């Protein structure tokens, strides 16, 4: 795999085929080791070591990045379309098949989406910053309770109805038993 990065266009692109030493050429090209590059290398190496991040990190290795500032990198403009498509596909494929999850996915949002919108990765917080509010809301988990997401199984409704009928029958039966029980005690008391 090849990881390409353009560091503020100060020098030529640096290539490496070893995913664990992503920025070794970049560190050598600057003449001294910046803490930023070390943190960037450590972040990607740490994410690669976890099993659940492998697909996402492999996806980002084919994307070209450029440095914005000391804490942020962004996808270069010619790779934004690919990055957005890969990100949306990975998030959608890792989503549980449940109606309460990712309810804001709409076909029109993806057909009319501007795939040149920047994607910024913050190295300190390890988060992606997205400037499209609709896509951000669709890719994040729901934060508010929505009455449309409540799933009611018909079997539960039927069981609830049976329980209500049984409780009503039991209440009437015990109420009549108590009434007849007190009447028989009153009759027995009068006979004595």
Curated annotation (Swiss-Prot):
Principal place of residence: host cell
Protein topology in the membrane: Single-pass membrane protein
The organism's place on the tree of life at top rank: Viruses
InterPro entries according to UniProt: PIF6 (IPR008005)
GO cellular component entries: host cell cytoplasm; host cell membrane; host cell nucleus; membrane; virion component
Residue ranges of the TM segments: 154-174
Alphabetically ordered keywords of this record: Host cytoplasm, Host membrane, Host nucleus, Membrane, Transmembrane, Transmembrane helix, Virion
Subcellular location(s) of the protein: Host membrane; Virion; Host cytoplasm; Host nucleus
Function of the molecule: Per os infectivity factor.
Protein name as catalogued: Per os infectivity factor 6
Species name: Autographa californica nuclear polyhedrosis virus (AcMNPV)
